[in-house]
């Protein structure tokens, strides 16, 4: 009421004036309000930028907010650097992330991040069907179908830190393979 329509602008730009002239508001409180307002303004700006990337593709309206919740102020950079990080969100698969990457961010067809995301997608799909291990050629072929490019080298490149390859050329996510072995050992001990 003190400043009328200028209240928000004055709070945003001059918290000292607010603290001096409005009884009951300390300088610390006025600065806190100013910081929150600036933070909200930054989030609004970020939301608009992310909406420009993911909006209009028929995706859920909450996606920009989910992205900001996950990556905070680094959301835009994370999205531009590797749009396939979207696959880490619930109900965002490779095809959705790939559509955003290809249509909006013009990611190259042969992008390493794109190939890795396709490989992870195929492996996750395989796990969701109850299979920890996938035959190497099947992984290569299914990844190639998704990306329309050769993913063999990407599989080799990520295999040391992410994948486990057995002697029969079957491949598994290291964590899933370790979990499977742990469960098998537990069951074996229970049955003996």
Residue ranges and their predicted role:
Residues 38, 43-53, 115, 119, ...:
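Long, charged amphipathic helices and adjacent flexible linkers at domain junctions
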Residues 65, 129-143:
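Short acidic, hydrophobic short linear motifs in intrinsically disordered regions
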Residues 116-132, 191:
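Short amphipathic alpha-helical interface segments
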Residues 1-3, 14-35, 50-71, 82-103, ...:
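Helix-hairpin-helix
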Residues 145-167:
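Charge-enriched amphipathic alpha-helical scaffolds
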Residues 5-8, 24-25, 73-77, 144-151:
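Short, basic interhelical loop/turn and adjoining N-cap
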Residues 133, 145, 166, 170-192:
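ASCE P-loop NTPase motor cores of helicases and related translocases
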Residues 4, 47, 112-120, 136, ...:
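Short, leucine-enriched amphipathic alpha-helices that occur as contiguous helical runs
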